[in-house]
Amino acid sequence: MKQDFEIKLYEVVDHQKSADGTEKFLFRLQDGNLIESVLMRHNYGTSICVTSEVGCNMGCAFCASGMKKKLRNLSAGEMVLQLESVYEVIKEKISHIVVMGIGEPFDNYQNVINFLHIVNEPHGLEIGSRHISVSTCGLVPMIYEYAKEDLQSNLAISLHAPNNEIRDQIMPINKAYRIEELVKAISDYIIATNRRVTIEYILIDGLNDSIKCANELADLLHGLNVYINLIPYNEVKEKPFKRSKKEQMRKFYDTLKKRSMNVTCLLYTSPSPRDTERYRM
């Protein structure tokens, strides 16, 4: 692998370990820019959350990554080097990859696609496509492009709101692609690929966590082959948003279950390979 790309592994600027086995790596790139990669350990294996850009232009109001404007795309080789550099430290088999780190993967589309092919090929890392997930905040045209790719990797949508009014407040991309367009793209993707889509929904206190919002979300996604992942908000000191209270998260979760939605929240259910709560940086 190394001889196909840059030979020198990244310098580890910072390495933090959490009690749950999660490890965060701050790497210095060849040009001096810094990126993060996150290692998660699960009962089904070890996964790496890969960064696709230096900075991010999506500007999601709740996200720490969006505070740093995008400087450039990462190449496929630079994404592979994140895996190699993490492996050099942990010396453990990497079983799953999630492209959900800093940056919008579909804003660096071709490099991300090249990366997915590299890690999946027999002479690469040989990670099965179904053990790879890519997350987007909703670049609708690229969802249609992704559906055409010769890939079996998973798609996750960062939705975080059940309607345009709330999504407009926290996700600028919604001004370009309304929630109705996004849901149609999700539906068309499912039909084209026969694959389930993960819906990521961060629960923010007083903003998108009401019972009304839960019912709106169920109405919005009714009949679609989706898996809703409720994510307790990871508070950012520079942001005004707060994590939903546990009892409110429970009510939101229970409302969706009563509406027969396929839903999980790691506060209440056992993690599976499709869970993405711990993948969010």
Language model region names:
Residues 67-96:
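Conserved alpha-helical substructure of the radical SAM core
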Residues 1-46:
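Flexible, acidic/Gly-rich N-terminal and inter-domain linker regions that tether
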Residues 87-88, 92-96, 101-259:
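Conserved AdoMet/S-adenosylmethionine-binding subsite of the radical SAM
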Residues 41-78:
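Canonical Radical SAM [4Fe-4S] cluster-binding loop centered on the CxxxCxxC motif
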Residues 279-281:
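Hydrophobic alpha-helical segments, chiefly the membrane-spanning helices
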Residues 268-275:
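Conserved small/polar residues in nucleotide/adenosyl-binding loops
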